[in-house]
Regions:
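OB/S1-fold single-stranded nucleic-acid-binding modules
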Residues: 1-15
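N-terminal regulatory/effector-sensing and dimerization cores
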Residues: 20-120, 146
Length: 175
């Protein structure tokens, strides 16, 4: 293993298996991965880069550890979470975990607004555009590889990255 682990290496080590499917890499400044497996609880050390997570399907009522207990709030399929770089997390699944993660290289968060989107944990929030783009990318990744599909997936991921760097609406903001 390299001296500095990527988000995906840390997640794979914690879950005990690699992502089901993934695209992107260090050269592109992002990596999108799907994680599916049955799990009880798991913990992640602080990740080197921020993470946008979409709860795709599987177990409802996933919780995260907050201060000294499991969160009252829970995630269901269709909700999103942002995990900032460096923050350790623990998760209570007790069933099938099915999430997609988008890692964005910290050095790609150039302006203040982009950095601000990833400076704190946001658990189980509604982001219809981010979720829709993620689901569409995911469905395309299971299609046969063609040059046209690759261009389409790249364009969708660029749109998702632009959306994330601009930032999903915060609670209380006008839509």
């Amino acid at each position: 293993m390299p001296e500095t682990w990527s988000n995906e290496q840390i997640i794979a080590d914690s879950l005990g298996r690699a992502a089901d499917v993934e695209i992107g890499g260090s050269h592109s400044g992002w990596r999108l991965s799907r994680w599916r497996q049955f799990v009880g609880t798991y913990s992640l050390t602080g990740l080197p880069d921020p993470l946008f997570v979409v709860h795709i399907s599987g177990k409802r009522n996933i919780k995260t550890w907050e201060r000294d207990c499991w969160s009252e709030r829970h995630s269901i399929p269709g909700l999103a979470t942002i995990v900032p770089a460096g923050q350790s997390t623990s998760w209570l699944v007790d069933g099938e975990l099915d999430v997609v993660t988008l890692s964005i290289a910290t050095n790609r968060l150039q302006n203040g607004q982009a950095r601000d989107q990833f400076d704190r944990m946001r658990f189980a929030f509604s982001d219809p555009l981010g979720v829709a783009l993620t689901r569409q990318v995911l469905s395309e990744l299971y299609q046969p590889e063609t040059p046209e599909r690759d261009v389409y997936v790249s364009t969708l991921v660029d749109a998702l990255r632009a959306h994330m760097l601009r930032g999903p609406a915060q609670p209380g903001e006008a839509s």
